[in-house]
Every structure is written in structure tokens, then in C-alpha cells.
């Protein structure tokens, strides 16, 4: 008997889901990019072979989006004239020594057949780009400007240096960043992409439920990390979609805490922000759990405020609705909830900031709610865990093909009060809320779920328990052994 995987899934195989993004879809993406560029030369760099610690290879997302090529040290060059592109993939040829280290890689015939892309050797790339630079066409780069691999000496995998050197050899060459165009294309997810996000989310939900069944006082954060990441791999994920954040007690209020070393103490909550990647597509789920299986009165109250804020955003996340309406509705609900708990003076009360200019950033910059609600509540999902969504562009509304999260949080810690300047207004505020802050001190609550905008409207797909009673029921059914 195969645990937790249906026979039907095993018969279909993981490769079937990966293959849902067809060569024709990759070609259509390149065609869309070509149409927007008109005339120019696109050069997109893939990720490099890890050479320092022999870690896992990660393909750069823009390159993967346009090619589907999953091997290292490659580049796509596409000559675009009149809105029509002619692509070529530059790849390292497999050698016996390279195969010994990294396994066999496809030959040019296999690439042409499987990806519908003609190929040349990576060694030919500099000369090819020099020739194209002399045509006078502008260069549109998708280089690894934000990747942490600048120490590599190979100019192919070090895209930033390659583009810089190309421009230096050809004075007057026009160089443009193609990322804004590609990001806008990536924002609308195809049915095949949504299927991969669904699968990544399904695996992640099972991981969270496995963790709920096994977490108990006396464990450490790394025990929970091991349980959930094991469940991800067992479910078919390539890896976690990002560094797992497992923070209990005071660490629950550290947004990107990743040490995952602390103990799980009775009476505390633990934030579990962890999810899987499948077929190159990421998802993102967070739950906040009671270590001993039951929320305290204060934890329940604060948790419900966060959950209500999430529900408000859900009601305002529909095709054609403004992303700002979702954000505003969530913060309004949380502000009223915080006021009812005595953690702020009123839903619209303000404070004096450390620097007066802080109040001009957003209409809510100096509202007291922003001391405890300290981050945004949505981002896209896709080839990156923070992927673009269509609401980032144009009229800023949700549209069919969006994949995104809603992740409100509240984090109560006295350090937020300590950063306020000593003014009469702030002294009065702190005096009024100090007792409540002490009661809720070191309580961090975040709930994060995954949603799709489809022809049916909003669809919630990360269906791990999230209501208080559901979570406590899961803890009552927990077991100990890991299968």
C-alpha cells in the first residue's frame, strides 16, 4: 500500500503534471514578448551550476517562463523583427566529466524536438551577441541582476557582467530591461500553471495537517520543520518554496525568523509559515497554532481579529474589484478588533512617529493599527513565491488568472511602543494601552491562504484547518510516530 498517494496519481506520474505546460505554451509566451518588443534582441539567462557548496540548482524564473528548460548554464537569445521572434537556446554540451557530476543532459536534437527550440553551444554566445549588437537593434536583457551568484567567473551564468561587457564593447548600444514586460506576462496564470499551483498547495496542506497531528510541547521548532518538509518531499514536491519560518513564543512576532531552533513551550503559539514547490511553481501557507493544543483567552481573541480581517479581504477579492478595497477592508476590521481589545485607542487613532515624514507614505502610516499590523496582506504566486499578479498593473483590479495569497497578521510586542518618540500624545497612548499590551505581549498571529481568480470568481484552495475549533480538533487527534 502506498501511503497518502492515490493509485491514480501514481499511474499518471509526476511528469504528467509537469508536462501540462507544453512547448506550444512556452512558444506562445515568447510570441507575446516579441509582440510587445517589436524590434530588438532578447537575451535571457538561466541559472548557473552551484559551484561553492554544491547546493541544489535553481532555474531563474524569467528564463524558465520563456523556455521550460530546467538545466543549468544556458541562455535564450531571440531576434525580434516586426513583432516576430526567432529564438535560439545556448546550452552546455554534455561531456563524460560533466555527466559524471550532473547526469546526462539533452543533446541539441532532443531540445529541438522536446522544446521546439534550435540550440547552439554556450561557447558560441559571446560571438553571436557581438554580431547581433552590430545590427543596431536594442538589447532587451533578462539577466540575473538580483541573483546572488555574481562571484561566478563564467560570463554566461553571470548575466549582469555579460550585458555590461557587451555594452562596453559596442558603444552606443541600447540596453533595456525586459523584466517589466515579462513580469506583466507572468501575472496572468494559464490553466496549466494554475494546475501546478493547485498541486503545490495540495502537498502543502497535507504537510500542515501532518504537523498539526504531531506537534506537542517539548519539541523544538526544528522538529516541526522536519515534519512538514518531510511531508512535502513525500508528497512529490521538489523542495520547500522558501525557507520555512517556524517561530514560537516571542519568535512568533519576528516576520522572517528562520533559525527554527527554539523550544515549544506550553501556553505559547507557534507560527508555521511553510509551503512546497511543485513543477517549479510555489505556494505559500501560514498557520498559527497553540503549542499545547488549546488557545488561551487572549490568543483566541487576537486570532479571531486576524481571521475576521482575512474574511473581509476575501469578500472584496473578486474579478473587477480593486486590490486596494481588499487591503482597506482587512485593515479596517483589524483596527476595530484591536480597539475592542484595548490595544489601540480607536480604529482611527494616530500616534506621533519618530520622523514626521513617515505619516506621508500612506494614509494609514501613523494610525495606531499600523504598530501591530506591520505588513501587507497579499502577493502573487507562481514561479516565485512573491510573483506578480495582474492587480499590480493597469487598473489594479483582480482578474481571471490571478493566483495570490491573503495573509493578515498582528504582532504584539512592547518594542513597537518603545520606538515611539516621547511626546505628550504618545505618552497618553502608551498609558492607555500598556495593560492590554502586557496581556498580549509576544503574541504573533498570522493566517495565510492561497486563492485563485477563475471564471467562477474567488476560489480558496489551501484548505488546511484555520478556524479555532478546527485547529483544536486536529490537535486532539494527534499522534506521535512519523511513518
Residue ranges and their predicted role:
Residues 4-16:
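Bacterial N-terminal signal peptides
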Residues 1, 14, 25-26:
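General helical secondary-structure elements
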Amino acid at each position: 500500500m502506498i501511503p497518502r498517494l492515490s493509485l491514480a496519481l501514481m499511474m499518471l506520474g509526476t511528469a504528467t503534471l509537469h508536462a501540462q505546460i507544453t512547448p506550444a505554451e512556452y512558444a506562445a509566451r515568447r510570441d507575446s514578448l516579441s509582440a510587445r518588443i517589436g524590434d530588438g534582441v532578447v537575451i535571457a539567462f538561466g541559472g548557473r551550476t552551484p559551484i561553492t557548496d554544491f547546493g541544489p540548482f535553481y532555474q531563474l524564473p524569467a528564463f524558465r517562463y520563456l523556455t521550460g528548460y530546467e538545466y543549468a548554464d544556458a541562455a535564450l537569445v531571440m531576434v525580434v523583427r516586426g513583432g516576430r521572434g526567432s529564438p535560439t537556446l545556448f546550452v552546455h554540451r554534455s561531456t563524460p566529466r560533466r555527466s559524471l557530476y550532473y547526469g546526462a543532459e539533452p543533446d541539441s536534437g532532443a531540445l529541438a524536438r522536446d522544446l521546439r527550440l534550435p540550440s547552439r553551444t554556450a561557447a558560441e554566445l559571446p560571438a553571436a551577441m557581438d554580431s547581433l549588437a552590430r545590427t543596431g537593434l536594442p538589447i532587451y536583457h533578462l539577466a540575473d541582476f538580483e541573483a546572488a551568484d555574481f562571484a561566478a567567473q563564467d560570463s554566461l551564468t553571470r548575466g549582469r557582467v555579460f550585458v555590461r561587457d557587451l555594452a562596453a564593447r559596442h558603444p552606443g548600444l541600447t540596453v533595456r530591461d525586459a523584466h517589466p514586460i515579462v513580469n506583466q506576462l507572468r501575472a496572468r496564470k494559464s490553466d496549466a500553471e494554475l494546475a501546478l499551483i493547485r498541486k503545490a498547495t495540495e502537498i502543502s496542506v497535507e504537510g500542515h495537517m501532518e504537523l498539526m497531528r504531531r506537534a506537542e510541547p517539548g519539541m523544538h521548532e526544528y522538529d516541526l520543520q522536519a515534519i512538514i518538509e518531510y511531508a512535502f518531499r513525500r508528497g512529490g514536491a521538489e523542495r520547500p518554496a522558501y525557507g520555512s519560518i517556524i517561530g514560537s513564543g516571542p519568535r512568533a512576532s519576528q516576520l522572517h525568523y528562520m533559525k527554527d531552533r527554539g523550544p515549544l513551550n506550553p501556553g505559547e503559539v507557534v507560527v508555521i509559515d511553510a509551503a512546497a514547490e511543485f513543477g517549479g511553481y510555489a505556494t505559500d501557507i501560514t498557520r498559527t497554532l497553540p503549542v499545547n493544543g488549546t488557545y488561551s483567552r487572549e490568543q483566541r481573541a487576537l486570532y479571531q481579529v486576524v481571521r475576521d480581517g482575512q474574511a473581509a479581504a476575501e469578500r472584496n477579492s473578486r474579478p473587477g474589484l480593486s486590490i486596494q478595497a481588499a487591503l482597506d477592508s482587512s485593515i479596517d476590521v483589524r483596527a476595530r478588533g484591536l480597539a475592542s481589545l484595548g490595544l489601540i485607542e480607536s480604529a482611527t487613532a494616530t500616534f506621533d512617529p519618530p520622523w514626521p515624514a513617515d505619516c506621508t507614505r500612506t494614509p494609514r502610516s501613523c494610525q495606531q493599527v499600523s504598530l501591530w499590523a506591520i505588513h501587507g496582506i497579499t502577493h502573487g504566486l507562481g514561479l516565485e513565491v512573491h510573483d506578480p499578479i495582474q492587480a499590480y498593473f493597469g487598473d489594479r483590479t483582480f482578474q481571471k488568472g490571478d493566483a495570490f495569497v491573503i495573509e493578515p497578521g498582528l504582532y504584539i510586542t512592547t518594542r513597537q511602543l518603545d520606538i515611539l518618540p516621547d511626546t505628550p500624545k504618545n505618552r497618553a497612548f502608551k498609558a492607555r494601552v500598556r495593560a492590554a499590551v502586557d496581556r498580549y505581549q509576544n503574541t504573533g498571529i498570522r493566517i495565510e491562504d492561497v486563492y485563485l481568480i477563475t471564471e467562477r470568481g474567488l476560489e480558496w484552495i489551501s484548505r488546511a484547518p484555520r478556524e479555532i475549533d478546527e485547529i483544536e480538533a486536529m490537535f486532539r487527534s494527534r499522534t506521535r510516530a512519523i511513518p
